[in-house]
Structure formats: structure tokens, C-alpha cells
Amino acid sequence: MYYDFLVKIPENTGKISKNKRKDVTYIEYTYDRKYIPEKKYNVPLRTTIGKMDPSDPTMMYPNPNFEKYFPDVVLPDTEKDASRSSCIRVGAFLVIKKIIDDYKLQNYLGSWDDRGKGLLLDLAAYSIISENNAAQYYPDYAYNHPVLTPGHKVYSDSTISIFLSEIGEDERIAFLNDWNEKRNHREKIYISYDSTNKNCKAGDVEKAEYGHPKEDVGAPIVNYAIAYDLKNQEPLLYESYPGSVVDVSQLQYVLEKFQGYGYKNIGFVLDRGYFSRDNIAFMDKCRYDFVIMVKGRGSFVNQLILDKKGTFEIKRACYIDEYETYGMTLQSKLYADDEVERWFHLYHSIRRESAERTQLENELRRMEEAMNKCKGKEAALPKKYTHYYELTYHEKNGKQILYGYKEKADVIERELKLCGYFAIVTSRKMTAKDALLLYKSRDTSEKLFCSDKSFLGNRTLRVSGSNTFEGKVFVAFIALIIRCKIYTQLRKRKAEMINRPNFMTVPAALRELEKIELIRQPGGNYKLDHAITATQKTILGSFGIDEADAKARALAIGKELMHAEEPEKEEDEYGTIEDDKID
């Protein structure tokens, strides 16, 4: 390959020679000499470094060999490459691309064309690496990163916005169906199901309704839930549903979906928010096991705790070292008219007791301060005040004036006795330790929601319509699949290491991998800027990528970028304006 610019032919007459073949004169450089013993003389070893300009015998068109043997010569850059950065960050992309290939995610997008597949996966990679989901910043990301679209074509923010709004419900459902169809439906797995919500100020999102927000800002909300396979450590499905629908009532619809997917031998690990008699009965009907957390102050379990209080809290046989907690198991009916008995696992933690006692005392102190300020005034106090205090009101001029209050000592003392205790209810027989370890394994799914909001840029979705909202949630789920794999592989590798380095977290690892860069040479080809460091080798090794493999993959991307298509031009000089409307 010869570059499309001219340089002066080197004047080193001892090593520069010309070789004319047909109508072209090639410039050759003698880089070494080899002695031939039989003939007793040296043979020059030459390589072509360019071809002479027919109109000027002092100038030539160089090739990559010229850069190799004359590195000090400054070559002009080409105008063609101005649309792409001369420094391409390739490290994090290598890991994401390998996970995409290992999962064969493109195969689950069977109805999509190559452009659509590439653009969807590019948006997922963009949200992981940049921790952002704003369409108007995607071209900035693609300017200095490889992409998965054919020809490494970079699309404008307007195209991205249109693309997100055109992702149809059939395409989203087809992906989830295919993603779950390929699994072993007879394998025993436990699924963690959890939900969160996003505050919404957009007027055109159909699912935005007033409900029970995690963080109340006085705005409608949209609910969002994820089901996570705890054994294989992979997200299985996601749901978005109206904000007025309470979590406890949504669970039965999820169970029906898993029945439809054909899962035969599964159990659910659930937070206390999903505990209800109807949900328990429905899981029994589906023959699905369950593991549900219950607070020690729960009305149906606190008597069990008080009955067993003092019988296991210091017994070493009951100690669970992993969580510095004592636990015991007993069998009992969940409801008086239950046909089967459940297994109740009772736990006590000194640290939890201290924290809960402090929290309760502080809450009582704040309530008393509030009531003291309201004395002699008309006051409508929340219901929780009457739980802990007897309030005395006097009627004056038709108004209820707060006169005084008195602690309900028996109620407070009972709750103090329950501080530090909690319970887990399971449908299948297991030890207290097994039940706790199984429940605690759902921490990964909780981290998924943290990732969704903090590390994928989805604290704010920046949409104003239902179609774009659904498209961005779908992209976020694809990104969660990939990022979850990054998290589990790093955690697995870190557990094997004697030292626990702080660069083995997902944000730190991605930042370190972003330092692996391809630098564009004057001829348009890309080369690694420097050797891969020991830290980067450790991170890449977590994903089965060794140094040689990383170099080969990076250089292959560099060759593809040499022939990359021109970026799409933005028709509107002001770009696409997105509103920060869904938090």
C-alpha cells in the first residue's frame, strides 16, 4: 500500500537505489547485507520504501516500510482521517466485543439488519464505557472508539433518536423469548426478582402514573423490574409497567411469564415487598419454591422470635461466619389455615441490633421534638405517631389542639427486644446458613439497579415519548447483560488473587482498559501506542484475553478503521435536543 502524499527521496546514496519495472520506478532501501561463504562476497538485502513521482524525480510516494526505516521523517497527515480521532481507545471495547461474541447476542436479534444490530450493541457499549445514555453525545464517543456498525460508520444523534423510537414491541419481546428459550429449563435455579422506579416529568410517557416512589419528588413514576438468574449470574428478563401498579401485585404476572418460557424447576428469592398471601398461594400453585425476607418486627413472625429469643444467639453451632450472624431453623405454618408447613429461619446480629436500636431511638427523639413544637397548636400528626404515643387533644373553637403525649412503653420495649432480629421464610427445607447465603446472593441483582442508575447513565433517561422510553429501557437491559458479565468475571478473578487490588471493580477496570490506545500513523494505519501494562494484562486475563490475543484483536480493529466509512453528517446544525425528563 502506497500513501497518497509525496515525500522527498532520502539522499543516502549508499543505501538508496532505484528499480524501474515497466513504467514505474521503485525506490529501494538496503537495510542489511548477507555474506555468502561459497561465493565469498556480500549480498545486499533490500526492501521497497516507495515509488517515484513521474513528474519530479526527487519525490516519491512512501509506503509503511518508509516509516519503519526513516522514523524521524515527519509525514503529512491525510485529510480523509480528520473525521476520526488519531487516538482510538480500544481496550474496554475488546472486552465488551468478546462478551457479545461469547453470548452470541447478535443471534438473538434475528429480525434486525446488520446496521440495526451494530447500532443497538454500540449504544449498549456506549452507556457502559461512557456511563451516559444521551443520544447527542454518542458521536463524541464514537469519534475515538471502535464501533460495531458495518464499516465502523458513526451515526448522528438525530439518527440515534429516531432509531430508539423505532424499536418495536415485537422486537423487544422476540429478544426476551429467544434469550430465555436457549436455556436449560430443567436446571434448578433461583431467580432474584426486584424492582425500582423512575420519577417522570414527561407528559407523553403512557406508563408514567402516580404511585409509590422510592424517592418522592411529587412526580409520576414508571416502574422497572429485573429477574436475575442467581446460579448462572445473568439477567433473564426486564419489565416496565405503570407507576400506579404496586410491586406485590405484579409478581404473579412475572410467574406466568416464566411458565410461558418453559422453566420447570425454579425458585424465587424475593424482598419483603413481595410478601402476600396471594403471592405465596400462586407460587405454590405453580410449584415454584420461594425464599422471602421478613423483618423481625413483622406481625406474623415476631412472636416466633420472642419465643426463641435467648435460645440460639450465643450458640456456636448456630454461628454463620460469612455474615457474623447467628441463626436457627424451625418448621411452622405461615397462616393458621395453611395446608403445608414452611421453614422459618430466625437470625440475630449484634451489629444489626446496635444499628436498629440507634435508628429507633433517633426516630423517637425526632417525633418528640416535632410534638413539642406542635403543643398548643392544631396538629394532624402522621399515623406512626399514634403507634408509639398516646396523643391528647383538646377541642377549641372547633379545632383539635395537641395538649400532650405519653409513650406507649410496652410497644417501644417490644420493638427494642426485636432489634437485630430478622427472618427468612422458605418453601423448601434447608439450613439457616443455606437460606441466608441464598438470600444474600441477590445482592448482585440489587447492584444491577445501582449499575443501571449510576454506571449506565439511566438516572435520567432523557426522553419525552413512550416509544423512545421503551427503546432506551431495552438498550439498558442489553447493557446490563454485558456489564453484569464484566462484574462477575472480575469478581471471580479477584477472589482467586492473594491481594485484592482496587482496580478489579468494573469502573476502575474500564478506566484502566481505556488507556489501551491505537495511534493513527501518517499513512492511515493504526498501531498500539505502547505495550500492554501488567495491570491491563490482569484485567484482560479475567475475560480469557492474553497479551498476544489483545494485540491481534487491536491491530485487526486498526485495519478495519483504515477503511471506515465517513461519519453521517448532522442535517440540523443544532443537533437533536433531548429533555432530562425521566429520572
Task: Please describe what each predicted stretch is.
Residues 220-222, 240, 289-438, 510-583:
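An anionic, glycine-rich sequence signature occurring as long contiguous blocks
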